Every structure is written in structure tokens, then in C-alpha cells.
Amino acid sequence: MTIEFSNFTFKYWALEKPTLKNINLTIGKGEKVVIVGPSGSGKSTLGQCLNGLIPFAVKGDCSGSLKINGKDTKSLDLHQCTNIVGTVLQDTDGQFVGLSVGEDIAFALENQMVIQEDMHTIVKDTAKMVELDDILDVSPFDLSGGQKQRVSLAGVMVDDVDILLFDEPLASLDPKTGKAAIDIIDHLHRDTGKTVIIIEHRLEDVLHRPVDRIIMMEQGEIVANMTPDQLIASDLLEQHGIREPLYISALKAAGCQITEDDKPAYFSTLNLDKFKPQIENWYHQSFVACTPENSERLLTVNNLSYSYDGIKNTLDDVSFHINKGEFVSILGKNGSGKSTITRLIMGVLEPDTGSIFMNGQDLAQSSIFERSQKIGIVLQNPNHMISHHMIFDEIASGLRNRGINEATVERKVFDILELCGLKKYRHWPIDALSYGQKKRVTIATILVLEPELLILDEPTAGQDYHHYTLMMEFVRELNRKLGITILIISHDMHLVLEYTQRAIVIANSQLLADAPVNTIFSQPALLEKANLTVTSLYSLAHAMGIERIDNFIHCFIEHEAKNK
């Protein structure tokens, strides 16, 4: 089923300028296409035009044409569009309508008044395709992130749609679960011949399996329409703020000139032999031993255990420490207990057993308010933290709650606005800011209180590479210049690799490892236990025959830090 955009332009009624500008794009029947681009580039708007949300549910002005199999979508209604294009959303919870997996998959069939006997057969067959046939009676809300996504996928597949649209399917998934999701999408594409369109930031993870083309968007326009090899060999990813595969970054760091003929889009097809001398030379010239860490303790966690239901431990006898001035990550798959550690540190939860000390004092003796004087936390979604209309008032709120006089409040807020690059926005309403700017406001709101420890929960969620790099470089400067200790909670292995010195790995409720990042990332068996995966940096070093892969990873980390 062919998709044809011809001189297609779309403008939301609420905006002055078009979000999509003069789009000309053809996607053939059975193609597998990836759409990439920075936040605000128009990727999701393009997807909403395909599935009929625009213009039937989301209003705006359209010009040009969009035809699916020769039919102009203006002649269709929303119901007809959804019978052609099945959409799997980033937030799968918002897509569930059934009390069980089976009911959710059957929802579309019930609307079509399919007889019950046929319905059972179709549901079972569809569930088997996405490996859910053994949990049809389970509530979808009790499943893991990867399982939830498969339920959503099955729910659109029973309609027997011709086009499958995935809107950021990897956004909330840990690396191993993300790879499994890409495997299933690839399996469906090969077995059914359906047209597959994937909108995603995490390009290297999507390229875990082959795709036909990559469409790159910027400011509402298509700036590239290429094969994966053509795009990866170009400099367009870097120019437009899209993270390129790690092994490509490492090859470029070593001065390697990559061409389309090298088949660079997939590590398995890349011609590595020609690059081996340059890689080895770069590695031997670049290696510098790690500097010893500051040994003065800030936070000590001793034998911490916690259970939400009193039966199964979410955390089981976990111990670790964080030194003053460190930049540390807690790494683990979804549901491993990472966020529970944060809640215990902040005092929102009380441990069943164990203790937490800060600067030698037992935090069990401190209230949540007293802990907040020393520890600041920035939540994944800035909208969950913001409580005031104006930027100045939001940042000043914590100081005012402490009874600080207004002259001091004003001085401190102005200082922090300057530090965070927000001074020119001080009189702006928060609603006028971008997502990344809101994130800076939440960090500023915490920093003005002068915490000793700053905790960032999934700081890169919902942000493209360009915007999250800006934010993380700012956080790195806070760590270097002000000496603020930083703790990141994440399953984003690229983030952990680029910015943190040490990783604490949690798996199956227990502490699995506590070591420098380059050591953690050079141990495949350990990563497998944590439901994580080796990075392509490891694969590159291994393919090159480098014995000390941890040192190779350390070289790359140092190179990236110097060139940010």
C-alpha cells in the first residue's frame, strides 16, 4: 500500500507557522522506513497525518495532498484511516482499553462484531505472533514495558492493517528490551510484508535490524531521504543533532574516513580490516590511566532492603557509597529497583532493614524536609515539579518556603538564573518554554537551595540528542566548577558511558556491580545478568583484537569529554 505526500503542508490552528512544509515523500508497499529528527522537527506530526489524527482529531490547515494507495486521505474519515494504519504509541498505558491482555487485543474485533469463536482464534494467533499467548489473562498494567508494547502491537494487528506506525517505541525501554522490540517488529515485517514506519531518536538501536530507508526531518522539512549506509557515511546526523552509532563515533575519533562502500550502517556488515591500523594507533596514543577518585564519603547505603507488598523484596541487602564531587550512575533495567533507591534516600519510603548515612549522620533521624536541605531531586518529567506560573517565582519558591528575606531571595535567584543560562527568561511564563528549558528551570529550582547531592531521574527521557547534550554538559559543569555530587538514575547506556565515572548496577533487587563505567561496559556476562547489552564500542574493540577493552572504552570516554 503506497503512501504519497505531494507538496504537503500542515499548520496547527494555534501556531503562526506551518509545522510541516512542502513535504514530498513516497513510501512503497512493504517498505520499512525510519523517520528521525530533533524534537520539534515534525516527525510526530507527520505520523499523525498518516493515521488520520490530523485533520480529523487535531485541527489545522492542510495544503497539498496525502494519498494512501491512490486515495486522498481527505476523502476518508478517522475510522477508515485507522483501518489502514495501526499506531503503537510511545505511552502504551494510554492505549489500553481491556482489563486483560486478551480483552485488549480483542477490542477491535468486538467493535467489528466478529463471532466469539472466530475472535478467540484470531486473538490467540495474534498473541502467539508477539509472544504473549501464555499471559492472555493477565492485566496489561501488570506487565513490563516491553510486554506492554507487544500488547499494543497485537491490538492493532488484529485489525489486519496494511501499515504499522511506531511512534518512539524505544523511549521507555531498557537496552535489552529495546532490542527485543526491534526483533519483533522486524519479524512481523518479514512475515507479513506490511509497511512499517518507525519514528525514533535512538537510531543505533533501531538499526539493530535492517531498514530500507531513513528519512531525516528538520524544522518541518525533509532534509535527507537515504539508505542507511548513505546517511551513516555522511555528516548529516552530527549536523542535525542526531546521535550516530557509537562505533562510528569511535572510528571518526581515530581519524577514519568512512564511505558508503564500507557498509557502515550495521556493525555486522562494516568493513573493519581497512580501519584496524588507525584504530590501534589511536588507542595506543590516546590511553591515559584513570585518576584516583576523591575518597571523602558523602552518602553511604548499608544493607538496604525494601518490599512494597511485604512478600517480594524490591531491594535486597543493597550497599554502596558515593564520594563527594563524584558523578555516579545507578544503572539497571526497568523495574530493577533504581527509583526505589531514590525514594528511600529522600525519605518518601522507609527501609525495612538497613541504613543510609550522609556526611556520617543517619538519615533515619531526618525528616523529608530536612533531607531536602541537603539533597535535591529532578524528576524525569519537569511538568511534575513545576507549581508556579512565572519562572522567577518557581525558582524562588524553595527559598521563600524557608523564610529567607526577599532581598536575599532576589540575589540568589538572579545568580542561579545567570548560572543556568535563564536570565533573559526571568520574566517569562513557564508555559512559553520548551521541554529542555523547563528541565533547566527545575534544575535551577533545586540548585538555588544549594544541595550537596543532586539526583537526576532519567534525565534524557523525551529529549533528542542535541537538547539532552546541552543539558548534560550544563550538569557536568555544575559538577566540575561547583563540586556538586551528581547521581543519575537511568537505563540509557549511552548517557552513562558519556557522563558518569562510576556505575552502580542493580539487577533482580540486588547490587550486581559497583565499578568504573569502562569496567562495567567491558563485561558482557555482567551486562547480560542486568538485562543490559554490550555497546558497539565493546564490539569494535573485540573485533579489533584489543585485549584491554576497558582501556579502549576509557579512551573513547576521554575523547568525547574533551570534544563536547
From Swiss-Prot:
Keywords, in A-Z order: ATP-binding, Cell inner membrane, Cell membrane, Membrane, Nucleotide-binding, Repeat, Translocase, Transport
UniProt: ATP 1 binding residues: G37, P38, S39, G40, S41, G42, K43, S44
Gene Ontology terms for molecular function: ATP binding; ATP hydrolysis activity; ATPase-coupled transmembrane transporter activity
EC number(s) recorded for this UniProt protein: 7.-.-.-
GO cellular component annotations of the record: ATP-binding cassette (ABC) transporter complex
Subcellular location: Cell inner membrane
UniProt keyword annotation of Cell membrane present: yes
Keyword Calcium in record: no
Protein name, as recorded: Putative ABC transporter ATP-binding protein PBPRA2240
